[in-house]
UniProtKB/Swiss-Prot annotation:
InterPro entries: Kazal_dom, Kazal_dom_sf. It comes from Megalopyge opercularis. This is U-megalopygitoxin(3)-Mo3. Probable toxin. Residues 1-20 form the signal peptide. GO terms for molecular function: toxin activity.
Length: 86
């Protein structure tokens, strides 16, 4: 009986965290617009933020749920690589 409640509470926590990540809105941060290509910040998991302000804002938002973002290399798409070569 006890394990049934633990499973239910765990599932609710996962759903809540997923909702928090999904419903973050970068416009709520009040970050000024930047040129996207020169100021991108990326995570190890492949998420790309337009600028440092958005990354820091999302990090602060997620830290309330105990989640930490880790910076990683920005992966260029095939189109972006071709454009960079020109």
């Amino acid at each position: 009986m006890y394990s049934k409640y633990v499973i239910i509470i765990s599932l609710l926590a996962v759903v809540s965290l997923g909702s928090a990540i999904e419903f973050w809105n970068p416009e709520e941060c009040g970050c000024p617009p930047f040129d996207k290509t020169e100021n991108e910040v990326c995570t190890k998991h492949g998420t790309t933020y337009d600028n440092r302000c958005q990354f820091d804002c999302h990090q602060k938002f997620l830290s309330k749920s105990g989640v930490a973002l880790e910076e990683g290399p920005c992966i260029l798409s095939a189109e972006a690589e071709e454009e960079a070569k020109k």
